[in-house]
Amino acid sequence: MNNRKLSFALALILSLSAMSCGSGGDVIGGETTTSEGGETTPEVTTPAEINRENAVIGLPELDFKGETINILYAGEKTYAQDVTAEETGDVVDDAVVARNRSVEELLKVKLNPIVFSDNTKETAEHLAKVILAGEDLYDLASVHQSYSKAYVSEGYYHNFANDQYIDFDKPWWNNEYMEEMVVGSERKFFLIGDISLMYLKSLGCIYYNKELYESIYKNPDEPYDLVFDGKWTFEKFDELTRGAYSDLNGDGTVDKADQFGAFGSKNKSVEHFVYGAGIRSTTKNKDGIPELTLYNEKTVSFAELLHKLYYENQGFLIAPNNQFTEELPMFQNGQVLFAPTWLRYADTFRDMKTDYGIVCMPKFLESDEYSTLVHDGTTVFVAPTTSKKTDMIGAVCEAFAFYNYKSVTPAYYEVALKVKYSRDDATAQMLDLIHSSAFTNFGYVYASQLDGLTSVREFVVNGAEDFASWYKSKESAALAGLAEVIETYKGIDG
């Protein structure tokens, strides 16, 4: 282990130990003042905004007498880090190991990670079969969002909404996300936020090659300035992408030997462009029931821009798949300016010889807020209703999320950007912006049940130009699918 990694690991262990010792709850200090009459009164202080430096866990002192918590997870490493790792000298692996030790010491429990399969779909299906059989094999599970959502209507997952140990107001939870995933209110079957490292890896973002940007547009930090000044719009992205194109081989045709501004697929990339621009396909009413709201003036206008990017911008390279097997090396080699992907691809860029930056997905209008769609390949944490340890699972989840927020997330940032996380650093501020704007939408989560309308993929796949006609052709099936999903939720207890 080199000195930098050793220093990080030692600092991490010491900080986690200190956090464990100070787990009696949040304390806001205040000075006392003495009046002329000799009476002392406490001076009222405004609570500081919670951040990664000052956050403390609010759990009471708990002792679960060494109880074992069985946690199911998918064995593929990208997903496994949610639950377990080995000390390898890698800052993220070591942070995960330190987190697990801290959770065990804090709550007096024994964490028992169990892998059934490396495959995320097989893992979700296995969990469902175990619950259906009434077997108490697992207390907690890290499962793929897209593959696990179907089983919530079967009543397989515990509702954490009123858990005595989880404080959903803390920044390590994405409360709105959890509420958006279900029908109704006061239902939290899926836990997500910093508890899931895969959630962080699944945040949509755009990498850019700083050296190439400087050679074309002079200022390599301009994308950061555009974001922070509120001017990072989809039209600006389209403009910069178009301007970056160059016919490198001089053959007069657009081919992969040329220089491009950006790349994207016709499916997953489309979803991140659409939802990142602030489009929402469904909206919850006052009772928490989702209603189809995709068709409006904003969506129609954005669809026109999306079509222009994919079919009228020679600087945009359409990728044949979501793995970007040819396009990622082109970005690394300085042949593509922007790489709209997910944060998880930072691992791929670790050995790039040139510097890269990272910005959020562009918004539609300057007046909009930035939005970061979480890819549905993220993991969510669920507790099987067959577990008899629901009294302690919430405490374990709260501790998991807290320690991730304090240490594992910053460790991943260090890997992602090759710099130590600092609140004063522009890249750290960008990551905080991406993290704080993370969301999902019910229509996105259940797009397959809504005839694919709410993913907007087919609009781009078919090369359609008239969004209104395309929408009308799918609206009836989407409404029927939405009604069916809503109906299935009515039979769920909790």
What are these regions (language model features)?
Residues D238-G243, H272-G276, R280-N321:
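Glycine-centered hinge/linker elements that transmit conformational signals in sensory
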Residues D247-D258:
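Acidic, glycine-anchored loop motifs typical of Ca2+
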Residues N2-E154, S407, A464-G494:
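Conserved N-terminal structural module of periplasmic/extracytoplasmic solute-binding proteins
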